[in-house]
Swiss-Prot record:
GO CC annotations, alphabetized: cytoplasm; Holliday junction resolvase complex
Assembly behavior: Homodimer which binds Holliday junction (HJ) DNA. The HJ becomes 2-fold symmetrical on binding to RuvC with unstacked arms; it has a different conformation from HJ DNA in complex with RuvA. In the full resolvosome a probable DNA-RuvA(4)-RuvB(12)-RuvC(2) complex forms which resolves the HJ.
Gene: ruvC
Protein name according to UniProt: Crossover junction endodeoxyribonuclease RuvC
Cofactor dependence: Mg(2+)
Family: Belongs to the RuvC family.
Length: 188
């Protein structure tokens, strides 16, 4: 499975592509950070991020995209910009029929380091080790994008099993309701 990991942002947006192999083996194929000037209009910044993401989607053909879920921060304008960038990125993937999954920062940290409260240095160190990189990915947005992709590779089987279980549960509920409705009609 080829996964594109995205750490969304307007000033810096981390992008990565990894491929998983046997077991927990993951190989990094590409990583970069898109930068936009903070003094540019938001629409221009979103367009710049979108253009680069669309190029990456066309060049790398990921099977799935993993985006960091925006969480509440103190700075509302930062949250808005991050959410807007994430929306533009998810839309680009959806237009190509690519599944998009969102992971919280604590899910990513727990998957990569074993500690949902790990700091940036710990995440970067583990990403470097997991991918057997010669150098630490910089800036932190690049490491975060790789961590998101790794997280999804490792969580995808569980996500698929949960979806199957939910679908089976829905079928059982529907069958049970039909049975009960039939029994009610029979008693009338």
């Amino acid at each position: 499975m080829r996964v594109m990991g995205v750490d969304p942002g307007l000033t810096r947006c981390g992008l990565s592509v990894v491929e998983n192999g046997r077991g927990s083996q993951v190989v990094a194929l590409d990583v970069d950070v898109v930068r936009t000037p903070s003094d540019a209009p938001v629409s221009k910044r979103l367009l710049a991020v979108s253009d680069v993401v669309e190029h990456w989607l066309d060049a790398h053909h990921p099977d799935v995209m993993a985006i960091e879920r925006v969480f509440s921060q103190q700075n509302v304008s930062t949250v808005m910009g991050t959410a807007q960038a994430g929306g533009v990125i998810a839309l680009a993937a959806a237009r190509r029929g690519i599944d998009v999954h969102f992971h919280t920062p604590s899910e990513v940290k727990a998957a990569v380091t074993g500690n949902g409260a790990a700091n940036k240095a710990q995440v970067t160190a583990m990403v470097t080790r997991i991918l057997a990189l010669q150098a630490k990915p910089t800036p932190a947005d690049a490491a975060d994008a790789l961590a998101l992709a790794i997280c999804h590779c490792w969580r995808a089987p569980m996500i698929a099993r949960m979806a199957e279980a939910e679908a089976l549960g829905a079928r059982h509920r529907q069958a049970y309701r039909a049975k009960v409705a039939g029994e009610v009609k029979a008693t009338r």
